[in-house]
């Protein structure tokens, strides 16, 4: 049972959020700035101008599992360098390659072995990891090691992992970014979603209310938004214990039974509907909440968005804001929209978890599973 009163009770939220999860999530902008500072101190600029044979994104459990798809989506199909996503450092990695990896687990033995092998073969390695343990030892003195400067739970470090990736892409000349501006947008989003702001003016709380008691169907109308949807589904599972379906709109549209559920189950119930006496308006189908996520405004993405809205008029459109809707030819601006949407879903998932009693006190331990 969701506690609706708690959602607009800042003192009550603070009382149940004993681990400071909302505050940790709101540090997204600070995570980005601190990662940029760590990159400067670690000498990431020595990779400036490099054109690797391949860019290897190692997706260990946790933040990089979300950061890597976001980076690939931002690069798009015109990226001049092959981008390889894998769970472990490939055995073929050599002197012509650049490896990017993130872990919150200092004892990740598989990553430590892979990093050591890649470095011995001459690859350039950029690693965000704790400064102690086997992973850091394997990378010591031979890689660009970005140690965390702000302590946040492992399930809320996507801004750090994403910032490290964006910094590397900028150094390689693959994607120009303004991390100061991106951090500023994250600060603004954190302020809009502050626990002290009521639901009708708080984007994250509003998003939470739209998902209470329903299965979210998170469908992206463009490639970048689809990658955000995947992160949102992970955040909902990690912080609220909610199972969601994440996919691109065209992929979801190819699932006929799911489209039927979405079309029938997304309609709002009649105000006079009695759930105990009346037949369910959805015909007994599961209660779902279709959400159409959008980032890009190129003609193809706009057409997909309109087609999705026409097919599912009851679906909720979700964007980072009109000022952050960008053309597909401006992936640097899209990075800010990606970060803002990801943060909004992180905060919404936390509000949902706290309001439903899944989080709070010792219940927070589950977030640590997503490292």
Language model regions located:
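A generic structural motif
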Residues: 82-89, 128-129, 242-254, 317-332
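Glycine-rich phosphate-binding loops that contact phosphosugars or nucleotide phosphates
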Residues: 49-191, 295
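Short helix-loop-beta junction
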Residues: 70-84, 234-243, 311-317
């Amino acid at each position: 049972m969701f506690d609706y009163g708690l959602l607009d009770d800042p003192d009550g939220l603070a009382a149940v959020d004993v681990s400071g999860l909302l505050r940790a999530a709101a540090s997204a902008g600070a995570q980005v700035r601190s990662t940029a500072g760590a990159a400067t101190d670690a000498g990431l600029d020595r990779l400036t101008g490099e054109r690797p044979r391949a860019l290897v994104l190692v997706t260990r459990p946790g933040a990089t599992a979300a950061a890597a798809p976001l980076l690939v989506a931002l690069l798009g199909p015109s990226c001049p360098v092959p981008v390889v996503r894998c769970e472990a450092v490939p055995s073929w990695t050599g002197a012509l390659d650049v490896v990017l990896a993130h872990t919150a687990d200092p004892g990740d033995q598989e990553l430590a072995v892979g990093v050591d092998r890649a470095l011995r073969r001459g690859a350039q390695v950029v690693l965000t990891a704790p400064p102690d343990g086997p992973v850091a030892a394997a990378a010591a003195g031979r890689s660009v090691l970005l140690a965390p400067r702000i302590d946040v739970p492992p399930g809320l470090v996507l801004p750090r992992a994403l910032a490290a990736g964006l910094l590397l892409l900028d150094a390689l000349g693959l994607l120009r970014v303004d991390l100061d501006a991106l951090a500023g947008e994250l600060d603004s989003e954190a302020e809009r979603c502050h626990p002290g702001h009521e639901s009708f003016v708080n984007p994250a709380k509003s998003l939470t209310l739209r998902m209470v008691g329903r299965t979210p169907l998170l469908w992206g109308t463009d490639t970048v938004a689809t990658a955000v949807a995947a992160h949102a589904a992970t955040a909902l599972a990690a912080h609220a214990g909610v199972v969601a379906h994440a996919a691109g709109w065209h992929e979801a549209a190819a699932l006929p039974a799911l489209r039927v559920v979405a079309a029938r189950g997304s309609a709002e119930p009649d105000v006079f509907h009695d759930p105990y006496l009346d037949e369910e308006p959805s015909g007994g189908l599961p209660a779902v909440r279709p959400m159409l996520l959008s980032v890009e405004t190129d003609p193809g993405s706009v057409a997909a968005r309109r087609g999705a809205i026409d097919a599912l008029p009851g679906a909720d459109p979700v964007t980072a804001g009109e000022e952050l809707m960008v053309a597909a030819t401006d992936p640097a601006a899209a990075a800010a929209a990606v970060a803002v949407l990801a943060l909004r879903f992180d905060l919404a998932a936390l509000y949902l978890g706290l309001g439903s009693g899944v989080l709070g006190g010792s219940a927070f331990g589950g977030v640590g599973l997503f490292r």
